[in-house]
Amino acid sequence: MSNASSAKEATAPKMGATLSPDLNVVKQSKGPVMTLADEFYKVGPGPSSSHTIGPMRITYDFYQRCTTLPADQLAKATGLKVHLFGSLSATGKGHGTEHAALAGLLGKEPATVDPLFLDEMKANPEQTYPVKLGDKTFNLSLADIIYDTTKGDFPHPNTMTCKLMGRDKPIYVQEYYSVGGGFIEWKGYQPPKKGQPKYLYSTMKELRQHAEKNNLSIAQVIMANEVAVSGKTEKQINAFLDKIANAMLATVKSGLSVKEGVLPGPIKLHSKAATVWERAQDEKYESDRAIAMVAACALAASEENARGHVVITAPTSGSAGVMPAIVYALVNSKRQVSMEKIREGLLAGLAVGYLCKHNATLAAAEGGCQSEIGVASAMAAALIAQVMGSNPQTLENAAESALEHHLGMTCDPVAGYVQVPCIERCAFGAVKAWTAFLIATNEIESRHRVDLDATIKTLADTGRDMNAKYKETSEAGLAQNLTIC
C-alpha cells in the first residue's frame, strides 16, 4: 500500500457497521413522524441537496461551533480543513460540493447565499477567502476541501469530517452526515426536542385512519400536527407554504425563459425546456399539450438546478423539477388552481415525503434514484389528489402507484453531474405522478392491491440491497457506458 493511500485511510472514519451507533439510535427508535415543513422544503442552490445544500449546512454549523470554542483553543488554531468521504468524494466535483463546503466555512447559508458567489468561486479556483475566528484571521481556499477515500465502512455514504487545525494536529474535529434532502446529522446526534403531534402516526395506514376517523383531509391532519409540533400558527405555516409555492413557480418561470444554452460541465448538454414549452402551445400539437406542458415545466426547474440556481428540495434538489412542474401546471392551466389549494397540496405532499424519510431514505447515495425521483413523484401525485378533492384512500393509492413504478431506479449520474439522466427523469416523474392520479381516480378504491406502507418498505429494502455502484457513485450504468467527448 502506498504512503498516500495510508494517509488517506488514516483520516477516514472507522466503523464496523453500515451505520454508526449514533445513527442507529435515530434510525431504529423512530417513534411518530416529527418532521416539519420548514425542515423538509428547503430553498437553496443546486445541483444537489445531499452534495450541495447538506455540505454547506454542515460547514456552516461547524464554523458556528468553532466560534464558541475557548479563546485559548482558538489562539492555537492555524486553519480549517474538510474531508469528504464516500459518495461525497466520488461525485462531489460534479455536484459543486467543494464550493458549497467552502462557502459554509465562510458563513454562507443555503437559503441566502447568492448563486453568483458560487459561480465566481468556480471561475477563480485559486482564490483565497479570509475567515475570522477569535482574534485570528485565516485565508481559506478550495484546497482546504479534501476529496478523501470513496471506499470504506462509513457511518453513512455521505460522510464528512470538519477540522479546526493546530500546528501539529487537529484541535477540534466533528464528524457529520448529509443524510438526504438537505438534512444533516452528526456523531452523537439526537433529534431536537419538539412539541407532541396532535395525531401520532408512523405509517400511512395510521395517518389515513386519523383522517377518516375525524372526517379530515390528509392536508388538515398534517396542518394540525405542524401547529402542535412547531408551536407556530396556521397563518405562519401558510405564509411559509406560500413562500415555497412562489419559489417553485419562480424556478419554473426562470427555466422556461432560457431559450437556448449549454448547461455547465463536460457533458455539453443543451437546455430544452423552452423548446418543449413552445411546442406545447402550438395548435398542431394540441393533443400533446397537457403532457408536454408538465414535462417542459419539470425540465425547466431541473435545468435551473443544473445551473446551480435556486431550487426547492421536494424532497431533494436532484428531483426538484417534479413538484414545481405540477404546481406550475395547476396554477397556469385552465384550472387556475388557487394558492389555498396549492398550500393544501403541498401539505399532502409532505405527508408522503415525511413517511418516506421516516421509514426509508431520501438519499440516492443510500437508496438510488428511486429515493429521489420516486419519492418526488409520489409526493406530486398526493398533491394533485389533494388539490382535486380526492379522499385519503384515493390520495394514498395515487402516491403508491407513483412510487411503485420507480422502484429499483438507479442513480448513475454521468460525469458526476446532476444532468444525465437526472433532468429528463424529473419530466418522467412529473408525468408519472399525473398518470398515477388518473388511474387512482378511475379505479375502485378497494381493488387497489398495494398499499403505500408496503411500497415504502420495498423502497427501503431495494435501496439496502442495491449495489453501491448504482448509488450516486458514477461507477456503473450510464455513468460508465456513455462516452463524454
Show which residues each predicted segment covers.
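Non-transmembrane, aqueous-exposed alpha-helical and coiled segments at domain scale
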Residues: A12-V33, D38, K42, Y60-L84, ...
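C-terminal regulatory domains involved in ligand/effector binding and gene-expression control
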Residues: P110-D282
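Accessory "access/gating" subregions that flank catalytic or transport cores
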Residues: E234-Q336, E340-Y354, H358-A364, G368, ...
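Hydrophobic alpha-helical bundle architecture
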Residues: Q336-V337, A348, L355-A427, A440-H448
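C-terminal domain-closing interface element
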Residues: E98-M121, T149, G374, M379-M388, ...
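Alpha-helical support elements that line or immediately flank enzyme active sites
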Residues: S50-T67, P324-Q336, A381-G389
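A structured, mid-to-C-terminal "fold-capping" secondary-structure block
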Residues: R208-L241, A245, T251, V414-C485
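Conserved phosphate/anionic-ligand binding catalytic regions in large, soluble enzymes, centered on
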Residues: Y41-T59, G308-I326, G367-S377
